[in-house]
Amino acid sequence: MAELASIIRPTKTPGRTSGRSTPGAAHLPPPLSTGLSDLLMLLQSPQKPGSGRARRRTVCRPRRSGPDGDFRPSSRRRTPRTRTSDTSRRRRTPAAPTRRTVCRRRPSSSSNTSSGTATSGESSEADWRDSSSASDDDRIPSSKTTTLKAR
């Protein structure tokens, strides 16, 4: 205990003059507490427009579980996000073969239009191809509309 007192006392008195020992000893605890409060504010701020329920969870869990509660709700928040991404990936996989079949139908339709309108006008043909290719690229993400229009 005497060694601890001898270590603590010089940090108080000469630290005021030099300014080297007090920032290490006196200013370490407040940044930790302010950092935790900032983390809580950052975690709460993006959820405010979404729902008020998420706010209550973030406020109540750290009080119940203590300092470890700052990390537990974040891990619980991340798990539903991964689940939603997995479900969205599962939804995207059946849509991929429909896109492939639509893409296979498009060149056949363009070849039909080229053979049918070769005599009428080549410039209008090129314009139609450019506009259709651009609109098809825009419509690709919504597979339902492309399949309905192609059929």
From Swiss-Prot:
- Basic residues bias located where? 53-64
Biased composition regions of type Basic and acidic residues, renumbered to the chain: 126-141
Q: Which superkingdom is the protein from?
A: Viruses
Residue stretches of biased makeup (Low complexity): 33-45, 108-123
Q: Which intervals of the chain are annotated as region Disordered? A: 1-151
Recorded protein name is Uncharacterized ORF3 protein
Look up and give the organism this protein is from: Torque teno douroucouli virus (isolate At-TTV3)
